[in-house]
């Protein structure tokens, strides 16, 4: 996923400081889904041999250190070249991803049902398939607006996408998150974030299902609070909200 241009400017400025501050770098990286994904993919790779996968940006930055982070930033800046038109189109996505992530963090802290750092990661990455769909399908944003308009009852946002493209941003986001080596419970939440009603109706007592419900409860509430339906779907009401 292409990184947000202004974030790259701020990160490159920090890396040229005599003593780059890891906390500042982590905060900047946390604002961008593309950079965060590349970071977590790296730190969770077999090279580091971690027994438990990391879902926290700050922990990943602390583990890697400034030199590896700077190399990652430089690599992403090369991959992130986009047309001005694409940058403008994706501004809505970047802004909403950050808002939802911060709201997930707050909700997780207040309720205590989910680790706050993982809730933040889910909020940041849940729509990571959107810019990839847009890159592949120029008409994607128009279809996404139609999808939000038709959502409700038994019709999911992803159903409209499936009819138009034979795939959807939840599926693309799931495989992207897996390629970043995010923990399995986070990738499952990304895959199901427009299938929440079916998940909530499932009375299976498995611990993994309970964890998925908690993640989706935090995420869907954050999406509603941040009006994702208005920003991404161009709708006056949230047809998914019940």
Where are these regions (language model features)?
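Conserved alpha-helical "signature site"
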Residues: 1-145, 156-239
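GAF sensory/regulatory domain recognition
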Residues: 146-152
